[in-house]
């Protein structure tokens, strides 16, 4: 199985470097010279890292296969993957990968409120994007207090939202009737 670790952004400079949206918690281990990535779309890869450096909190990667800005523009938006067999056991001690969470039912008590559509890894905390049956997106802070249970085998996550979480995301949303999130 493959794990997405980055998405390629815009070109940087004239030597083929690109900005990268990092989707892993260990960029210093994943993005080192000589690392080869499976790329989606397949026509853009595989790609092998030539250089990696940080510029104002933005990761810049150079690839052996990309010589100039024009070639870098062609791979813009491509997704970089590693094979999960390459992951060490340390990586599996805690936490989940996006591919494990996407598609799980999001529940408040016994009420299904939607499905997990994405996981955004951010510097302060991760966010889950839950899509409701009406097609609206709700951003849920992925912290133990709000998402106390993740049951990949059972196909769901349990949410205990604080009052107002659903309204913050959408003025027309209704709080689930389960009573979860009441402060009293």
UniProtKB/Swiss-Prot annotation:
Sequence ranges assigned to domain PRC barrel in this UniProt record: 93-165
GO terms for cellular component: cytoplasm; ribosome
SUPFAM superfamilies listed in its UniProt record: PRC-barrel domain, Translation proteins
InterPro entries recorded: PRC_barrel-like_sf (IPR011033), PRC_RimM (IPR056792), RimM (IPR011961), RimM_N (IPR002676), RimM_N_sf (IPR036976), Transl_B-barrel_sf (IPR009000)
Any one biological process term the GO annotation gives: ribosomal small subunit biogenesis
Molecular functions (GO terms): ribosome binding
A Pfam short name: PRC_RimM
Keywords: Chaperone, Cytoplasm, Ribosome biogenesis, rRNA processing
Highest taxon above the source species: Bacteria
Localization (cell): Cytoplasm
Domain notes: The PRC barrel domain binds ribosomal protein uS19.
Family: Belongs to the RimM family.
Complex formation: Binds ribosomal protein uS19.
Function: An accessory protein needed during the final step in the assembly of 30S ribosomal subunit, possibly for assembly of the head region. Essential for efficient processing of 16S rRNA. May be needed both before and after RbfA during the maturation of 16S rRNA. It has affinity for free ribosomal 30S subunits but not for 70S ribosomes.
UniProt protein name: Ribosome maturation factor RimM
Organism this protein belongs to: Paenarthrobacter aurescens (strain TC1)
């Amino acid at each position: 199985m493959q794990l997405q670790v980055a998405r390629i952004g815009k070109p940087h400079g004239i030597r083929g470097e690109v900005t990268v949206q990092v989707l892993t918690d260990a960029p210093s281990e994943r993005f080192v010279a000589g690392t080869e990535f499976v790329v989606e779309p397949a026509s853009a890869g595989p790609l092998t890292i030539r250089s990696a450096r940080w510029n104002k909190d933005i990761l810049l990667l150079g690839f052996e296969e990309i010589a100039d800005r024009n070639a870098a523009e062609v791979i813009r938006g491509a997704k970089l993957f590693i094979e999960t067999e390459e992951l060490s056991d340390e990586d599996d001690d805690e936490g989940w990968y996006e591919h494990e969470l996407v598609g799980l039912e999001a529940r408040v008590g016994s009420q299904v409120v939607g499905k997990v559509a994405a996981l955004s890894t951010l510097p302060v905390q991760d966010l889950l994007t839950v899509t409701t049956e009406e097609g609206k997106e709700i951003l849920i802070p992925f912290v133990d207090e709000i998402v106390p249970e993740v049951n990949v085998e059972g196909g769901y996550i349990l949410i205990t939202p604080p009052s107002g979480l659903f309204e913050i995301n959408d003025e027309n949303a209704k709080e689930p009737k389960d009573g979860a999130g009441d402060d009293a």
